[in-house]
Every structure is written in structure tokens, then in C-alpha cells.
Amino acid sequence: MAAEFAPHEAYATCSKSLQHEWKFVARVVPGAGEQMGQLEGIIRDRLIPVLMKGRRNGGPPTQYDVWLRDVTALPVRLLGLGIPKPTETADRDYKTSAAASEAITEAIFRGEDIDADEHVKTGQKARAAHKEAVKEAVEKEWERLGS
């Protein structure tokens, strides 16, 4: 694994590129979170241990592995690595994308002209709701990990 030789570069690649790729899939494919278990396993069992200079024994995840994965999913401002769990975030990402594109989708289905202002308003509202939902989820996880 490249992360063994260049952990910083592997982290940067994950946080700047790969996350955007799997988030795109999550936004456009309903139920994508169910299909991202293998990706989550690779992040938890291979990437995170290498970044933390730990080594996995290849067995099932230990309680420590699960805890470490939970911590690394936290935003950097809360001392995590900001590597979200694709299995847990995909459904929320899809719902936000569907809500943000609702006005334009409906106009296309009805064969009507697209109201750009309505599309922008719908998108802004969906993004604001998404941001609030993510904030609440992060705060809940922060409290759970702190107790």
C-alpha cells in the first residue's frame, strides 16, 4: 500500500480526491452506502492503521480499531482526520442531492422551462439543511466519543 511509504501523500489523496469521487457516487446512486462496505473496510483496516503507524493483524476489527475509525471520521477541527465513513454518509448525501435538484428535475419531467431562480433557492435550502444535519451528527458523535 502506497500509504506505507508516503503516508502524508496518501492522506492528502484520500482527503482531496478519493472522498470527492465516492461522494459523487453517493450523490447520484440511491442506496450507494450499502455498496461501500468494502471501501469502509479498506479505510478502517488498511489506511488508518498505516497513517497512525499501526499495523493490522488481518483479523476482525478490534474495539480499538472501531474507536480509532470513529475518531478519524471527526473533522480536523475536532482532532479527527476528516475522513468520513462512506457507509454512513451516502444516504444523507443522496437525499441532499435529490432535494437540491428537485426543481430542475420536476421541470424536466413536466417539459417546462427551468426556473433558474427556483433551482438556486431549492439548492441553497437543501445545502443548508445538509450542513445542519452534518453538524448535528458530528456533535452527537463527539459527545458519544467523549463519554
Question: Where do the language-model regions lie?
Answer:
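Nucleic-acid-interacting cores, centered on viral/eukaryotic replication and modification enzymes
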Residues: 1-147
